[in-house]
């Protein structure tokens, strides 16, 4: 049982360390009042994604002590801070699409979330910009486009 726990813990740490990188691939134009704005097509805001999906442990928070309840909550605050910082670097008209794209792949498919869990994540995603003091809530569709 201990071996299984250690393997699971190592897998969590490895996946968290791997998921801490962001990548921008291409862009598309968003028509605006003064001309077109460039928005990233595929921006992986892993800090926002991990925060919204309650994947809050980070390598910096790996416990030196076995008091897991102390480092787990700190990881959530750290991820939220990094998420807000990265959202602040995005053009305001692109933020909601980027937030939606960050979680969309995790909400559907054969191994997707249960409906109530997905609804909670979507609601959190909608409220992420105001939580970061970066504008009004997003208009992300509730269950449209997801597989149940």
Curated annotation (Swiss-Prot):
Keywords: Antibiotic, Antimicrobial, Disulfide bond, Membrane, Plant defense, Secreted, Signal, Toxin
Principal location: membrane
Signal peptide coordinates: 1-19
UniProt-annotated location(s): Membrane; Secreted, Extracellular space
Entry comment on modification after translation: Five disulfide bonds are present.
Source superkingdom: Eukaryota
Tissue spec: Endosperm and aleurone layer of developing kernels. In the aleurone layer, mainly localized to starch granules and the surface of the plasma membrane, forming a uniform layer, also abundant in the intercellular space. In the endosperm, mainly localized to starch granules and the plasma membrane, but less abundant in the intercellular space. Not found in roots or coleoptiles.
Alphabetical list of InterPro entries matching this protein: Bifun_inhib/LTP/seed_sf, Bifunc_inhib/LTP/seed_store, Glia_glutenin
Record flagged with keyword Signal: yes
One Gene Ontology molecular-function label: nutrient reservoir activity
Alphabetical list of Pfam families matching this protein: Tryp_alpha_amyl
Propeptide residue interval(s): 20-28, 147-148
GO cellular component terms attached to this protein's record: extracellular region; membrane
GO biological process, one term: defense response to bacterium
Coiled coil: none
SUPFAM superfamilies membership: Bifunctional inhibitor/lipid-transfer protein/seed storage 2S albumin
Record's function text: Acts as a membranotoxin, probably through its antibacterial and antifungal activities, contributing to the defense mechanism of the plant against predators. Forms monovalent cation-selective ion channels in membranes. Has antibacterial activity against the Gram-positive bacteria S.aureus and C.michiganensis, and the Gram-negative bacteria E.coli, P.syringae pv phaseoli, A.tumefaciens and E.carotovora subsp carotovora. Acts synergistically with PINB against bacteria. Contributes to grain texture and hardness.
Protein name listed in UniProt: Puroindoline-A
Natural source organism: Triticum aestivum (Wheat)
Gene: PINA
């Amino acid at each position: 049982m201990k071996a299984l726990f250690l393997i699971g813990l190592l897998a969590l740490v490895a996946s968290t360390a791997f998921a801490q990188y962001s990548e921008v691939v291409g862009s598309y134009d968003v028509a605006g009042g003064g001309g077109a704005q460039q928005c990233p097509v595929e921006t992986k805001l892993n800090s926002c994604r991990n925060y919204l999906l309650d994947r809050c442990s980070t390598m910096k928070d790996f416990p030196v002590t076995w008091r897991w309840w102390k480092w787990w909550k700190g990881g959530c605050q750290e991820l939220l801070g990094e998420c807000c910082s990265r959202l602040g670097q995005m053009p305001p008209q692109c933020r909601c699409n980027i937030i939606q794209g960050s979680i969309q792949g995790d909400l559907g498919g054969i191994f997707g979330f249960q409906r109530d869990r997905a609804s909670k994540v979507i609601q959190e995603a909608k409220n992420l910009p105001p939580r970061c003091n970066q504008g009004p809530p997003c208009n992300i569709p509730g269950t449209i486009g997801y597989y149940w």
